[in-house]
């Protein structure tokens, strides 16, 4: 039986969204967590306790996808308002938006090198963009229904997409051709992603299943029927040995891909779980749901064998559970009681600073102070509020100074023109005579 110390546990419980949480993602150093919601807001949560959260306001409709850039300097968000926004997660709240599609944008994702974006939309297309200046590169157009999700492969050579046409398509980025279609799902495919090795893909579907394909052999190698509701999202552990899934049945499931079995069922959300994501190192994962909550869990279960998992990654192999692996709840694995870990978690409602959007026509600067880079003496909420207010005042004073300078220049020009007019007038008027000529008789 697994020891208690190896069970995943709920570490944080963030409250602040006003509607269903639709997407979550950690930055590279796991110091921040971004979440998007049907409330149209992007939240950035600081993992360090007692630090404020930030609400970024700019989208005009629901946010359906968020993704941190590999460097952590940018966050991309996709919205029902048909736009994609790039945010600098700083106290300035800078953002740039571009109209990406003619329909709802369901998905946005950075490439591994952080230079490209891929978006998926209800307009049935997938589009690829440069991050710098958001230049459109090309579109992929073979789906015949809404495209729910699109992701780059780890090496950036391939793109995988999932659609309501019940297909998953694999695309070659260079040739821009569809090189494989998988049509084995009984329902719509909500989410798809690459295994960290790039050799497999996993998909979550409305028929309550999770399927894993080997894209080298174009073969279904694992088939999980462990949820009793629609599967909304999934995430691979960076080791490649575990897969976590989120479902409308209110649970998260941890799957052991090496052994082809269900490892844990996690309860915590009060309603459908809509999104889940491992941190870059795999030591945490976050989930969001229709209960408007963001939960951060400590992984724990990979601690004892992590070196072996990394070795597995290096060998670039992937476990096959046969043609189909039917999964049942194992009797020898500790199953935490419903909400057992929730009471142990920090139930946080941090002070939230709302950042109204400041759209930029020029490229975003990455040098702004990040929202997690506070000095110790500024971590107190009141001091941060004062600092933010002072920064705003300084900005306004700078604007006033520039305005006064412009007015002084205009006044000086006016004075010069007036002086010139007076001089010209004096030069054209003949001198007048003061005396009058007397007539003689």
Swiss-Prot record:
<dbReference type="GO" id="GO:0036064">
    <property type="term" value="C:ciliary basal body"/>
</dbReference>
<dbReference type="InterPro" id="IPR050505">
    <property type="entry name" value="WDR55_POC1"/>
</dbReference>
<keyword id="KW-0677">Repeat</keyword>
<keyword id="KW-0963">Cytoplasm</keyword>
<feature type="repeat" description="WD 3">
    <location>
        <begin position="100"/>
        <end position="139"/>
    </location>
</feature>
<keyword id="KW-0853">WD repeat</keyword>
<comment type="subunit">
    <text>Interacts with pat.</text>
</comment>
<dbReference type="InterPro" id="IPR036322">
    <property type="entry name" value="WD40_repeat_dom_sf"/>
</dbReference>
<feature type="compositionally biased region" description="Basic and acidic residues">
    <location>
        <begin position="348"/>
        <end position="361"/>
    </location>
</feature>
<dbReference type="GO" id="GO:0005737">
    <property type="term" value="C:cytoplasm"/>
</dbReference>
<comment type="function">
    <text>May play an important role in centriole assembly and/or stability and ciliogenesis.</text>
</comment>
<dbReference type="InterPro" id="IPR020472">
    <property type="entry name" value="G-protein_beta_WD-40_rep"/>
</dbReference>
<feature type="repeat" description="WD 4">
    <location>
        <begin position="142"/>
        <end position="181"/>
    </location>
</feature>
<feature type="repeat" description="WD 6">
    <location>
        <begin position="226"/>
        <end position="265"/>
    </location>
</feature>
<protein>
    <recommendedName>
        <fullName>POC1 centriolar protein homolog A</fullName>
    </recommendedName>
</protein>
<dbReference type="GO" id="GO:0005814">
    <property type="term" value="C:centriole"/>
</dbReference>
<dbReference type="GO" id="GO:0060271">
    <property type="term" value="P:cilium assembly"/>
</dbReference>
<feature type="region of interest" description="Disordered">
    <location>
        <begin position="347"/>
        <end position="376"/>
    </location>
</feature>
<comment type="similarity">
    <text>Belongs to the WD repeat POC1 family.</text>
</comment>
<dbReference type="InterPro" id="IPR015943">
    <property type="entry name" value="WD40/YVTN_repeat-like_dom_sf"/>
</dbReference>
<feature type="repeat" description="WD 7">
    <location>
        <begin position="268"/>
        <end position="307"/>
    </location>
</feature>
<feature type="repeat" description="WD 1">
    <location>
        <begin position="16"/>
        <end position="55"/>
    </location>
</feature>
<feature type="repeat" description="WD 5">
    <location>
        <begin position="184"/>
        <end position="223"/>
    </location>
</feature>
<feature type="coiled-coil region">
    <location>
        <begin position="400"/>
        <end position="427"/>
    </location>
</feature>
<keyword id="KW-0175">Coiled coil</keyword>
<dbReference type="InterPro" id="IPR001680">
    <property type="entry name" value="WD40_rpt"/>
</dbReference>
<dbReference type="Pfam" id="PF00400">
    <property type="entry name" value="WD40"/>
</dbReference>
<dbReference type="InterPro" id="IPR019775">
    <property type="entry name" value="WD40_repeat_CS"/>
</dbReference>
<feature type="repeat" description="WD 2">
    <location>
        <begin position="58"/>
        <end position="97"/>
    </location>
</feature>
<keyword id="KW-0206">Cytoskeleton</keyword>
């Amino acid at each position: 039986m697994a020891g208690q110390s190896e069970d995943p546990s709920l570490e944080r419980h963030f409250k602040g969204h006003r509607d269903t949480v639709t997407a979550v993602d950690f930055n590279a150093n796991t110091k921040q967590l971004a979440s998007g919601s049907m409330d149209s807001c992007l939240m950035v949560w600081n993992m360090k306790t007692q630090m404020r959260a930030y609400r970024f306001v700019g989208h005009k409709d629901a946010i359906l996808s968020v993704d941190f850039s590999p460097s952590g300097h940018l966050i991309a968000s996709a919205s029902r308002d048909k736009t994609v926004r790039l945010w600098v997660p700083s106290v300035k709240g800078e953002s740039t938006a571009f109209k990406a599609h003619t329909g709802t944008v369901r998905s946005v994702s950075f490439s591994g090198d952080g230079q490209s974006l891929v978006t998926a939309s209800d307009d049935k297309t997938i589009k690829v963009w440069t991050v710098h200046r958001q230049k459109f590169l090309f579109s992929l157009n073979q789906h015949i229904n809404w495209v729910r999700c699109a992701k780059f492969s780890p090496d950036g050579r391939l793109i995988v997409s999932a659609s309501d046409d019940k297909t998953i398509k694999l695309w070659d980025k260079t040739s821009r051709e569809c090189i494989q279609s998988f049509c084995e799902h009984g329902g719509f495919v909500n989410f798809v992603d690459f295994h960290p090795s790039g050799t497999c893909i996993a998909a979550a579907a409305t028929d309550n299943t999770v399927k894993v394909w080997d894209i080298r052999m174009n073969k279904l190698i694992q088939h999980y029927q462990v949820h009793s509701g629609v599967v909304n999202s999934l995430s691979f552990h960076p080791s490649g040995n575990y897969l976590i899934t989120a479902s409308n049945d209110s649970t998260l499931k941890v799957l052991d891909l090496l052994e082809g079995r269900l490892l844990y069922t996690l309860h915590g959300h009060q309603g459908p779980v809509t999104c889940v994501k491992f941190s870059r190192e795999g030591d945490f994962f976050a989930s969001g749901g229709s209960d408007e909550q963001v939960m951060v869990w400590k992984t724990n279960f990979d601690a004892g064998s992590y070196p072996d998992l990394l070795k597995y990654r290096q060998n670039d192999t992937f476990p096959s559970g046969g043609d189909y692996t039917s999964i049942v709840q194992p009797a020898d694995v500790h199953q935490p009681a419903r909400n057992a870990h929730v009471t142990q978690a920090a139930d946080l409602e941090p002070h939230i600073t709302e950042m109204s959007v400041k759209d930029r026509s020029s490229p975003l600067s990455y040098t702004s102070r990040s929202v997690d880079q506070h000095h110790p003496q500024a971590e107190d909420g009141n001091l941060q509020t004062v600092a933010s207010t002072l920064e705003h005042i300084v900005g306004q004073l700078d604007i006033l100074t520039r305005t006064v300078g412009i007015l002084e220049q205009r006044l000086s020009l006016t004075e010069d023109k007036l002086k010139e007019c007076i001089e010209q007038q004096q030069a054209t008027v003949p001198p007048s005579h003061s005396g009058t000529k007397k007539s003689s008789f």
